Amino acid sequence: MGKTSRDEILNAARLAAQAHGYTGLNIRGLADEVGIKAASIYYHFPSKAELGAAVAQRYWEDTARDLATLRETEGDALKSLSRYPHIFRRSLESGNRLCMGSFMSAEYDDLPEPVKEEVQKFADVNVAWLSIQLQEAGLTAPEESEKRARAIFSAIAGAQLMARSRNDIHLFDELIDGYAQAGLLPVQG
């Protein structure tokens, strides 16, 4: 089945939001990118807030699927944890973009409520997944796993932000290696 106009709008909106955040969701610019009239976007998304919420929802849903696939592909929790930073690296590889959840989190005070809710779900999905992997790998006790998961999520998002600000993907790799050497991320032997 081919992509619908709605899918094309959401894909274009995702790229715009990864490069420019919520404020980068310009209806006219998205319409030009997709090759439709701006009114057509309003048919699918009656407001910018609804578009922002829909693109943020799709982003965390895609991330949840990516994390599930990562776990299935790697076969064990420790390997999955060691591959986790690569999810964030892919955004940098794609036009030096930032994780959309991180970008929109930085704009949090200016986001409409429905967008805030979806952005929070992105962080929740990542922290929950990390917490489970940490427990399954035997790296943390259940009562400590969420705290370490938040630290890992925050550190990797921060590494991505710093690498983007320098347009230097190798800096991201260096920071991730540093986190592993410091014991925040597991090292596979």
Give residue ranges: language-model regions.
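Amphipathic C-terminal alpha-helical segment
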Residues: 91, 132, 153-171, 182-189
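Short helix-capping/turn signature of helix-turn-helix
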Residues: 45, 103-110
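Amphipathic, non-transmembrane alpha-helical scaffold segments
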Residues: 2, 10, 56, 60, ...
